């Protein structure tokens, strides 16, 4: 033990002598000398490490020290390259994946999380609000009315052994704001239920015009559309037959179903069928891709007069009694089956 202490004292004495001689010779700062190299080689590695200050300035009281093996947070790594304001740092995404905006990011998110938006459209007095209330009040599932909205209902339902979130909007007619809300429906809806009353032929005659408006608002999307003949329980007041509704659906390439919101007849089948139609259309869109925008290599086509929606609707109605009834019968054979395209 005395030998080790004497050796350490000798090393310290040589180090002091080396520092004194270096100061007298006024060697440039940082210039190595043979005497310094010899002294460093004689010292023990433990002593050299103890003399080195690897931790920097002492941490402030109460601040936890970070281990050398712990990675620096990603936010501070970015700050080394450029200044990052704490207020501008994006917050972590919420588990629910909700958002106030209705952009493409949210559209992709809703598709991933199984959220489907269904719009009820049609003339007034056909039973849209009754259908929406029936959907929100069906027993056996979790249903509630969304906050700050009297005409929007959200439910978790099971469709083909898969749980989804279905949101039903009844905002097609809202007084002075009806025009803006209708445009909002056109851009955000995943499926559209055109409701008409089987006791009102005048409202039934406006279905083609409503459908043309939907497709004109989103011309390059394969939108699921279901024609809903409501109030089927009023047999004595019926003005539109089941066959007429199916013929119209076959002509317009839509689905068709008759319901009675008052008796809850076919209401569950309607909304579950809407979910199936959305899935089928999305699956076909992913397989074949969206239809490309129309373009011409010779430049834009000259402007032409567009046919009004009223004239188009009249033309559709003129074809309700087809020349080849057998062809339209085959075409409308599966329009009532909401589980197929």
Curated annotation (Swiss-Prot):
Location in the cell: Cell membrane
Keywords: Cell membrane, GTP-binding, Membrane, Nucleotide-binding, Phosphoprotein
Phosphoserine sites (modified residues): 27, 296
GO molecular function, one term: GTPase activity
SUPFAM superfamilies, per the entry: P-loop containing nucleoside triphosphate hydrolases (SSF52540)
Compositional bias annotation for Low complexity: 90-106
A GO CC term attached to the entry: plasma membrane
Pfam families associated with the record: Ras (PF00071)
UniProt biased composition (Pro residues): 294-303
Sequence ranges of Polar residues compositional bias: 18-30
SMART domains: RAB, RAS, RHO
Segments for region (Disordered): 1-71, 84-106, 282-309
PANTHER family attached to this UniProt entry: GTP-BINDING PROTEIN REM 2 (PTHR45775:SF5), RAD, GEM/KIR FAMILY MEMBER 2, ISOFORM C (PTHR45775)
Stated role: Binds GTP saturably and exhibits a low intrinsic rate of GTP hydrolysis.
Family: Belongs to the small GTPase superfamily. RGK family.
Protein name, UniProt field: GTP-binding protein REM 2
Organism of origin: Mus musculus
């Amino acid at each position: 033990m005395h030998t080790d202490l004497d050796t350490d004292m000798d090393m310290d004495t040589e180090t002091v002598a080396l520092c004194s001689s270096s100061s007298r010779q006024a060697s440039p700062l940082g210039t190595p000398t043979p005497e310094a190299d010899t002294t460093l080689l004689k010292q023990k590695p433990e002593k050299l490490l103890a003399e080195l200050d690897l931790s920097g300035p002492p941490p402030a009281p109460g601040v936890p020290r970070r281990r050398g093996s712990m990675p620096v947070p990603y936010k501070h790594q970015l700050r080394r390259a450029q200044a990052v304001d704490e207020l501008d740092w994006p917050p972590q995404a919420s588990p629910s994946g909700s958002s106030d905006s209705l952009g493409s990011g949210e559209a992709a998110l809703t598709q991933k999380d199984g959220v489907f938006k269904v719009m009820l459209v049609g003339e007034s007095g056909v039973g849209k609000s009754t259908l929406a209330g029936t959907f929100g009040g069906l027993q056996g599932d979790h249903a509630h009315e969304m906050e700050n909205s009297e005409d929007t209902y959200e439910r978790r339902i099971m469709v083909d052994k898969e749980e989804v979130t279905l949101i039903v909007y009844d905002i097609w007619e809202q007084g002075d704001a009806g025009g803006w809300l209708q445009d909002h429906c056109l851009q955000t809806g995943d499926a559209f239920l055109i409701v008409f009353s089987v006791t009102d032929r005048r409202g039934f005659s406006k279905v083609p015009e409503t459908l043309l408006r939907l497709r004109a608002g989103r011309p390059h999307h394969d939108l699921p559309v279901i024609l809903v003949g409501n109030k089927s329980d009023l047999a004595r007041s019926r003005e539109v037959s089941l066959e007429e509704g199916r013929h119209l659906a076959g002509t317009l390439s839509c689905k068709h179903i008759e319901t009675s919101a008052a008796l809850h007849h076919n209401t569950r089948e309607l909304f579950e069928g809407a979910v199936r139609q959305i899935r089928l259309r999305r699956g076909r869109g992913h397989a074949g891709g969206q239809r490309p925008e129309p373009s011409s290599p010779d430049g834009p086509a000259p402007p032409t007069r567009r046919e009004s929606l009223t004239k188009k609707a009249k033309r559709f109605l003129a074809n309700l009694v087809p020349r080849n009834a057998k062809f339209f019968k085959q075409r409308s054979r599966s329009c009532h089956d909401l589980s197929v395209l």
